[in-house]
UniProtKB/Swiss-Prot annotation:
GO terms for molecular function: rRNA binding; structural constituent of ribosome. It comes from Guizotia abyssinica. Belongs to the bacterial ribosomal protein bL20 family. This is Large ribosomal subunit protein bL20c. It holds the Pfam family Ribosomal_L20. The keyword Hydrolase does not apply.
Amino acid sequence: MTRIRRGYIARRRRTKIRLFASSFRGAHSRLTRTITQQKIRALVSAHRDRDRQKINFRRLWITRINAAIRERGVCYSYSRLINDLYKRQLLLNRKILAQIAISNRNCLYMISNEIIKEVSWKESTG
């Protein structure tokens, strides 16, 4: 059987993989087999950490909102604020509330006070 030379197709495939791993250290940027393994591992980690990043930012926003709310009143907390927001049907997400808590605390206090007044008034009237 005659030998078939792969030519430029295999070389092009390998150079494309090598360009991806050019910033890796040691054999991870030189040997084709380890480059492909590290590429798969890097893409898996990137996919996992994109979801993880969303979770971490949500936790950070919740912590910031809770810290700002509890600073004002001991009896009021993050969970009650979010519950009252849903009762009033206000569309303020956690990211926006965290930005308000950092940049303008008085605005957040005004929002929470209005919500407390409205909810307590509705509960007292029946």
